[in-house]
Amino acid sequence: MKPSIILYKTLPDDLLHRLEAHFTVTQVPNLHPETVARHAQAFASAQGLLGASETVNRALLEKMPALRAASTISVGYDNVEVDALTARKIVLMHTPAVLTETVADTVMALMLATARRVVDVAERVKAGEWTESIGPAWFGVDVHHKTLGIVGMGRIGMALAQRAHFGFTMPVLYHARRRHQEAEDRFNARYCDLDTLLQEADFVCVILPLTAETRHLFGATQFARMKSSAIFINAGRGPVVDENALIAALQNGEIYAAGLDVFEQEPLSVDSPLLNMSNVVAVPHIGSATHETRYNMMACAVDNLIDALQGKIEKNCVNPQAAG
């Protein structure tokens, strides 16, 4: 008899068929308590769980006593209580490598859009305000040869540094938990403490996961240390930034602009002051959102679950100790 799994994400037919070749699949729309109750028997017998974005917590795990592996279609997993999974010997798989280049493209796009005011001036053209040759009120600032500060030198940070160094001749500063020799060798990146990076960088790009240590890492003190001409980019996790402090820094002219792919609360409230600022480019968590990359992420998550339930967790496992 095939192992049974719960699938809470719609997959392309070919990927669904791949799952069905290995498992008995129960598809559900979400992991809400009423959904779990409606499919109680399927949840109780499921050995695998696959999907994205929904909360996976102790309450859910209590309803899934047979669960052995969970596979998330994402690199981030702050919506998952990893400690609870580990305590129950449940491995968590994720999809870190397949989205690296696409997210780095998004960060670069935010840098260019904020610096050159692409969204702001495009909206003004559509509003009929382009009635004569443009003057300084429409100008942006250069990106090339400016200093880039990367906070979080993981895979995405490395891909961003490559674009900045080779494509835009940007000096690269970085701050991370440990020095990254490859970044220093390939891109002449300079390791520095966070305060130094904030004081020297023209672009501060945050690419950090959400942890107890990184929550509200950026607040009023950090924005005050940045240049008034600096552009702030967040493509990691929203709660890494104290959003009220960011709003104040923008309103008070402490920084020049911000490009934001993530927010403290998502979706972003329509009442957020950020949406009324012409120097803010706000996009709806599109970091990996291309057709190609999202397909590759789903395919990776499918393969991860198949591997995990066969005892293969050599790659993409968040908590390998759970299998011990």
Curated annotation (Swiss-Prot):
Keyword annotations: Cytoplasm, NAD, NADP, Oxidoreductase
Domain of life: Bacteria
Gene Ontology MF terms in the entry: glyoxylate reductase (NADPH) activity; hydroxypyruvate reductase (NADH) activity; hydroxypyruvate reductase (NADPH) activity; NAD binding
Keyword field contains DNA damage: no
EC number: 1.1.1.79, 1.1.1.81
Active site as annotated: 237, 266, 285
Localization, UniProt: Cytoplasm
Protein family: Belongs to the D-isomer specific 2-hydroxyacid dehydrogenase family. GhrB subfamily.
Subunit: Homodimer.
Protein's UniProt name: Glyoxylate/hydroxypyruvate reductase B
Lineage: Bacteria, Pseudomonadati, Pseudomonadota, Gammaproteobacteria, Enterobacterales
